[in-house]
């Protein structure tokens, strides 16, 4: 491949920060919806699965509706990934946030089982399916867009900003549920209170749409289209054949990230209420505080990843959860409130290492012309099988074994696998150009350096297979 120094991408760091805000709103929307659903599962179950008398089974059905929707995420990933690689990242990101806002609003408007019978859970499932389909193109698109718009040397620190949206969305959901449960009686929450957050989610979606319409296309995508007008026509089977190792590493990384993520954000509130017997308000406050602490932690680990490499930060997370998952869950059973808080914080601390590094690292595993679709499909298949099913699996493990520490064993096993895969198969890409692209720089000094060192600028050429 002939090197042309004029193709080195000069990006504006300030504009990159605005990009993080606009894309982070979509993450906030996704996790606001998910957080509200997780916190209101008891009310949703009572409204849509009221004929089921057993509370545990009703809870599992409510989580199952969530898990089934995750099966649509890979389909959304395929559709939006192909569109994103062909027509650009921006068009997908503006579409997905509209669909997410609509599905969230729909859940808040649905009649209950007592009003329309079996149609109630069917419509609930369809709303979750639409949510799953749209989010199939959302997060991978946001990661890709931010990675392609950021200076290479700051990719992880800026990427970690995406998770501010994720955590903020969940915090907003937690605060809203805490406020509602404080001012409304349980009967009022079951009747109409649980619907309020879903209805308000519409405004968050509209705000995100407003910001995203102002985005420009990512400089990497524009540069690649300009320099490679006849982009490689490669199908998914060829992608798997050429890049199976990268796909496998990405798949495993998404597994240990999302099992931990959904364990803490989706399952832990239910665990604290049903197993530990904390009240809903206390649970909401605890989770909210831990999420708030995770925001500066994620930003800190993002900066650290740019300095020492994301691989080492990955290993801090997987190694830490291998050693401390069981201990953290044991602390949750303490009679001391402070000790319970420490147990939750341990889980949140190590989760923040993933929140910091995944957005800036996963897009680097794939070449530009296949990045969106490959990341989107790999990410969503992994999330569908392991992430979205985590609350259901954890609930089933506790019910089946009678051991309240069963979720910790599951988390430990996943962390061990992640630690081994990252140790032996992952190549750190912090500070390097994205595969298939020229470097992204934000100053003339870096631009001049890469102009004089083309092999470092295009380090990926020697391993490209198509």
UniProtKB/Swiss-Prot annotation:
In terms of one coarse class, where is the protein primarily found?
membrane
Gene3D superfamilies listed in its UniProt record: MFS general substrate transporter like domains (1.20.1250.20)
Q: List the GO terms this entry assigns under cellular component, sorted alphabetically.
A: plasma membrane
| Record Pfam families | MFS_1 (PF07690)
Question: What GO molecular function annotations does the UniProt record carry, in alphabetical order?
Answer: symporter activity
Topology in membrane: Multi-pass membrane protein
* Membrane spanning residue stretches: 20-42, 63-83, 91-111, 116-136, 164-184, 191-211, 247-267, 285-305, 313-332, 337-354, 377-397, 405-425
Compartment(s): Cell membrane
| InterPro entries (UniProt xref) | H+-coupled_symporters, MFS, MFS_dom, MFS_trans_sf, Sugar_transporter_CS
**Disulphide bridges:** none
Q: Which UniProt keywords apply?
A: Cell membrane, Membrane, Symport, Transmembrane, Transmembrane helix, Transport
Q: Outline what the protein does.
A: May be a proton symporter involved in the uptake of osmolytes such as proline and glycine betaine.
Family named by the database record: Belongs to the major facilitator superfamily. Metabolite:H+ Symporter (MHS) family (TC 2.A.1.6) family.
- Spell out the protein name for this chain: Putative proline/betaine transporter
UniProt organism field:
Staphylococcus aureus (strain COL)
């Amino acid at each position: 491949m002939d090197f042309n120094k004029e193709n080195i991408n000069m990006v504006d760091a300030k504009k990159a920060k605005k990009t993080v805000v606009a894309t982070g709103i979509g993450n906030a929307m996704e996790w606001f919806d998910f957080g509200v659903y997780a916190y209101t599962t008891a009310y949703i179950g009572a409204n849509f699965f009221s004929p089921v008398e057993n509370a545990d089974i009703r809870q599992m059905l409510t989580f199952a509706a969530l898990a089934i929707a995750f099966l649509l995420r890979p389909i959304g990933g395929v559709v939006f990934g192909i569109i994103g690689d062909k027509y650009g990242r921006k068009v997908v990101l503006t579409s997905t946030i509209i669909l997410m806002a609509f599905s969230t609003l729909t859940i808040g408007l649905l009649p209950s089982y007592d009003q329309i019978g079996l149609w109630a859970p069917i419509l609930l499932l369809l709303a979750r399916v639409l949510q799953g389909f749209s989010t199939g193109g959302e997060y991978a698109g946001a990661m890709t867009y931010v990675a392609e718009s950021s200076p290479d040397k700051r990719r992880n620190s800026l990427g970690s900003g995406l998770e501010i949206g994720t955590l903020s969305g969940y915090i907003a959901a937690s605060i809203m549920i805490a406020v509602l449960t404080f001012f409304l009686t349980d009967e009022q929450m079951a009747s109409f209170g649980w619907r309020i957050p879903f209805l308000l989610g519409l405004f968050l979606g509209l705000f995100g749409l407003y910001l995203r319409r102002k985005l420009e296309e990512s400089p990497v995508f524009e540069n690649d289209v300009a320099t490679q007008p006849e982009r490689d026509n490669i199908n998914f089977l060829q992608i798997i054949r050429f890049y199976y190792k990268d796909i496998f590493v990405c798949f495993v990384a998404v597994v240990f990230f999302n099992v931990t993520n959904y364990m803490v954000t989706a399952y832990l509130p239910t665990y604290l209420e049903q197993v530990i017997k904390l009240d809903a308000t206390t649970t909401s406050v605890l989770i909210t505080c831990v999420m708030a602490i995770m925001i500066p932690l994620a930003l800190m680990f993002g900066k650290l990843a740019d300095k020492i490499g994301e691989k080492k930060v990955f290993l801090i997370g997987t190694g830490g959860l291998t050693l401390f998952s069981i201990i953290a869950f044991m602390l949750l059973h303490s009679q001391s409130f402070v000790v319970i808080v420490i147990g939750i914080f341990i889980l949140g601390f190590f989760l923040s290492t993933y929140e910091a590094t995944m957005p800036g690292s996963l897009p680097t595993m794939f070449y530009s012309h296949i990045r969106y679709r490959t990341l989107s499909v790999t990410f969503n298949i992994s999330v569908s099988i392991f992430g979205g099913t985590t609350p259901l699996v954890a609930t089933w493990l506790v019910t089946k074994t009678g051991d309240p520490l069963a979720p910790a064993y599951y988390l430990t096993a996943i962390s061990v696998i992640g630690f081994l895969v990252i140790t032996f198969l992952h190549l750190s890409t912090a500070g390097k150009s994205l595969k298939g692209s020229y470097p992204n720089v934000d100053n003339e000094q870096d631009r001049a350096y890469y102009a004089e060192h083309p092999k470092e600028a295009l380090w990926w050429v020697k391993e490209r297979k198509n």
